[in-house]
Amino acid sequence: MAPKKRNGFMTFVKEWQANNPVARGLSNSEAVAKCDPIWKSMGDQERGPYNSMAKNANVLERTAKKERLNCLGGSVAEMEIEKNEAISAELQMKRKIERIILTAKNSMELENEDFVFVSFNYFTKALTGDIYVPAEFSACRYSLKGGISSNYSTMINPGHIIYGQSRDAQDHSKTTHKLPLPPQAFGETNMGKLYIDIFNWLSVRNEEKLDQDPVIVYTTPELMPVVKSCFRYLASEAEIDEDERKIMVFDIHHLFYTLKKSVLDVAGVTNDRINFHVTNNFFVKDFFEYTEGISCDYHEKIDRSKYCTNSMVKRWGFTFSDYMCADLAIPLQPGKHIPLKVKPNYTITPASSSTNFDEISLDSYYSAPPRIQKEMGSRDLSPSSSHQSVSRAYVPRDHSVYGGTLDSDEEFPSLGGRRRQLPDKSHFNMGAGKKIAR
């Protein structure tokens, strides 16, 4: 139903109510009854200003756009603007990554291009706002040819956590990194000094860039809001100018895909079957997730290396090497391209000599099936042969299935995985056609 238009009479009534002390206690209907004889006694010249005011109010009401709200009371227009800005920022980030790779490729320096991988652990997140309290930071500098050339790792003690969120911080720490909460936390307590140290380390290999160029780091899409927020948290206490170079956080998954496409192009290999879903699926498998000796001493001791940021950034570098170095014939160096201690994911068993070993080529040396029937011969099983061919013929071992025969209903296994055991006949007395238990 359309709203009623204003008229000159009601405009006069509202003004009479505002200016006449007698009308303060009257309702609208009573005020209308009082003003009706006054309005009828007024001439057209006296009514003119009120009619003009009502007309102008109607025009303004028609032209004014009413802001739409969502079910939570937020502005729909503002949400659309934020959504469009996020899409635009993501497109600009992807184009920037593609330009970096293309520039390195055209200059024949693709294998020497440095990339910095970063990761943060946090204690808790604010209920309102994108604020994370940092707990641990790690970064590594990586290139295809040199592997992991250097890394930076430190624990952080912010001194306190967000008021009222101690329980959330305890639960998050218990299920992930298991770092003690502030004020008993480990590591640096001066956030400003720590930010300057991190920024200086990230800028070591960027002397040739202009001072206003940002420092680009890479992390996973899930950690991008965490990394951005933790950098802001540290920078808030640092004495830096607004014109200082900033840190930009980019998506490592898109870098992984773009770099793989360029590596195959340089190697002269067809890359038509390579798409973002293929490379992303390989990356998230995280074949080095439980590798020993790549996390900090604390997480190594408490068996939480999976959640250690130092382990994360190194595993990303190893994944890059495992997926791309063989395409450029780059030898894998233990400790730089692959872990120092490598445990292959399969058990070698002898097979018939008729097996064709060149039937398939694994994408990763660490993604092989649990058991591979393979003839030993003189095949190299070193980590550098990550793309060696293996046979499809393998026998999976699944200890969760029941291995007995199921010839009758009595032998069908119960829900717990055990076959029902029938009692021995000696436990019963046979008499009067009934079985009576002792």
Swiss-Prot record:
Record's GO cellular component terms: cytoplasm; nucleus; P granule; perinuclear region of cytoplasm
Keyword vocabulary terms for this entry = Cytoplasm, Developmental protein, Differentiation, DNA-binding, Meiosis, Nucleus, Oogenesis, Repressor, RNA-mediated gene silencing, Transcription, Transcription regulation
Which GO terms fall under biological process for this protein?
A: germ-line stem cell population maintenance; male meiotic nuclear division; negative regulation of DNA-templated transcription; oogenesis; piRNA processing; regulation of miRNA-mediated gene silencing; regulatory ncRNA-mediated gene silencing; spermatogenesis
Is Transcription regulation given among the entry's keywords? yes
Q: Which GO terms describe its molecular function?
A: transcription cis-regulatory region binding
What InterPro entries would the database entry show?
HMG_box_dom_sf (IPR036910), Maelstrom (IPR024970), Protein_maelstrom (IPR039259)
**Bias category Polar residues: which stretches?**
381-391
Function text: Involved both in the piRNA and miRNA metabolic processes. As a component of the meiotic nuage, plays a central role during oogenesis by repressing transposable elements and preventing their mobilization, which is essential for the germline integrity. Repression of transposable elements is mediated via the piRNA metabolic process, which mediates the repression of transposable elements during meiosis by forming complexes composed of piRNAs and Piwi proteins and governs the repression of transposons.
Q: Indicate the family of this protein.
A: Belongs to the maelstrom family.
The entry's protein name is: Protein maelstrom 1
State the organism of origin: Drosophila persimilis
